[in-house]
């Protein structure tokens, strides 16, 4: 941060540790898990992307057999591409009257309470940005489910098996490595007859017949049948009402969608210039600054402010490497 900013809003290491520290429901947040993080030295730059078609047989249509003394066949090629990125600044603050700090009868520091409160706002907003990107009908290939997964006649395993083939073919023969569900769709899987009828073992024991499966058992079934290693459930909820209005909560990750695609394997290399080289993936997380926190007093010394701030960007990279399935829950 610039020195002038630090003088006005000094970073407090204790409060920074508090905003990073997890609260009990933070395990529902998946934004930091689903993307490959790319730590960049500058807020903006260029990512240079390899063209995967260059490795799909750029010599197609050529006769590679060479007669003695003749020239070798020259294969074709596809230009590599580039995109620009710019990490954005995200920040939030809250304040408390000095008198309330002095008069507080609650256990613990009021500043620490504000730090946790502000951090939760920041983390939920980050989760929302991730969900808005990966569940966006316009950022990736999209199709509608043949039936909602909570329908009695639905066959979600068969649907997901076919979706994997669709992603595989669109990605030039690369298998999807990530599957993300909204919680409603995922919970419907545990009650679905096709999934409940699956016979197999999992970490918690043996599952078969008409037993309703635990979340861990459903994930194990999906990994076993689909061969997709990274499976996540977006279960976080957020109050969507403005301050002063009646509380209205909703899921951050839409309950009637899922994402399947390639979010691993960028093998990104960050150059001194700030540019990034890598293989294409569906989306990346460009991280310029980790979340930090601090506190400062108003000029008239009547209020104390606590803030949190981070600099990052979730960015779609290749629309063909991800697929959004809609209509998965009624």
Predicted regions mapped to residue ranges:
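Short, surface-exposed loop/turn segments at secondary-structure junctions
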Residues: 104-108, 259, 286
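C-terminal structured domain segments
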Residues: 264-307
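A general structural signal for short secondary-structure junctions and capping/turn motifs
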Residues: 169-173, 178, 222-223, 250, ...
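Intrinsically disordered, low-complexity linear regions
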Residues: 2-29, 49-50, 141-142, 148-163, ...
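Assembly/oligomerization interface modules of large self-assembling protein complexes
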Residues: 25-93
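Extended oligomerization regions of viral-like shell subunits
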Residues: 174-280
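Protruding loop/beta-arch "assembly-hinge" segments enriched in small, turn-prone residues
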Residues: 1-34, 290-330
């Amino acid at each position: 941060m610039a020195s002038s900013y630090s003088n006005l809003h000094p970073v407090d290491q204790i409060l920074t540790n508090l905003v990073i520290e997890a609260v009990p429901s933070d395990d529902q947040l998946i934004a930091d898990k689903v993307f490959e993080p790319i730590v960049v030295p500058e807020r903006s730059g260029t990512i240079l992307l390899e063209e995967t078609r260059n490795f799909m047989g750029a010599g197609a249509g050529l006769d590679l057999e060479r007669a003695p003394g003749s020239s070798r066949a020259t294969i074709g090629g596809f230009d590599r591409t580039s995109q620009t990125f710019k990490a954005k600044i995200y920040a939030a603050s809250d304040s408390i009257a000095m008198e309330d700090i002095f008069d507080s009868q609650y256990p613990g520091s009021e500043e620490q309470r504000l730090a946790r409160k502000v951090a939760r706002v920041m983390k939920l907003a980050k989760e929302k940005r991730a969900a808005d990107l990966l569940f966006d009908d316009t950022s990736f290939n999209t199709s509608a489910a043949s039936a909602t997964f909570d329908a009695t006649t639905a066959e979600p395993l068969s649907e997901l098996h076919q979706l994997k083939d669709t992603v595989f073919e669109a990605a030039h023969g690369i298998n999807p490595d990530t599957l993300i569900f909204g919680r409603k769709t995922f919970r419907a899987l545990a009650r679905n007859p096709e999934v409940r009828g699956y016979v197999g073992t999992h970490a918690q024991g043996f599952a078969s017949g008409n037993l309703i499966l635990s979340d861990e058992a459903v994930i194990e079934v999906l990994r076993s049948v689909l061969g997709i290693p990274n499976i996540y459930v977006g279960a976080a909820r957020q109050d969507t009402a403005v301050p002063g209005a009646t509380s209205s909560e909703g899921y951050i990750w839409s309950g009637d969608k899922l994402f399947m695609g390639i979010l691993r394997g960028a093998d990104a290399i960050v150059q001194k210039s700030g540019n990034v080289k890598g293989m294409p993936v569906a989306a990346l997380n460009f991280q310029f600054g980790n979340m930090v926190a601090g506190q400062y007093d108003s000029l008239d010394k009547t209020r104390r402010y606590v803030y949190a701030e981070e600099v990052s960007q979730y960015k779609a990279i290749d629309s063909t490497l991800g697929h959004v399935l809609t209509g998965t829950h009624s």
